[in-house]
Regions:
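Conserved P-loop NTPase
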Residues: 74-122
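P-loop NTPase motor core
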Residues: 1-65, 69, 79
């Protein structure tokens, strides 16, 4: 059977579901079914920041039922736009919550710690 599944994106999958509660119920049932099958799922979701309220998901409910959240994004540093990765949540694992600059090189992925106070538009 299938052991790994990527859904890109949860936003597209759930856009016609009329309420956050129904989205939560659907994603919980999906996660439970996949776990029963022994399938690891990676759900891709667009995130937004609306004023002081930031979400780690499209609908504001996915993060409550997920085991892990890894954020990929862009940040400006000295006039350059850099990619970053941040592990926000990972159940059963101690991890740094800091942002790391992400660079794709011919030798593979390179992660570099970002300076805590060096951010512009963080």
């Amino acid at each position: 059977g299938v052991t790994r599944l990527v859904i890109d994106s949860v936003t597209t999958l759930c856009y016609k579901i009329p309420s956050e509660q129904l989205i939560r119920d659907f994603l919980f049932k999906l996660g439970k079914a996949l776990a029963t099958l022994g399938c690891t799922a990676l759900l891709v979701s667009e995130i937004t920041s609306s004023g002081a309220k930031a979400y780690w998901s499209s609908f504001g409910v996915e993060e409550a039922i997920l085991d892990g959240i890894i954020v990929l994004g862009d940040v400006e540093r000295m006039g350059h736009l850099l990619r970053f990765v941040q592990v926000v949540k990972m159940l059963g694992s101690s991890h740094a919550r800091a942002k790391y600059a992400l660079e794709l090189t011919p030798k593979g992925v390179m992660l570099t710690p970002m300076l805590k106070w060096g951010a512009v538009n963080d």
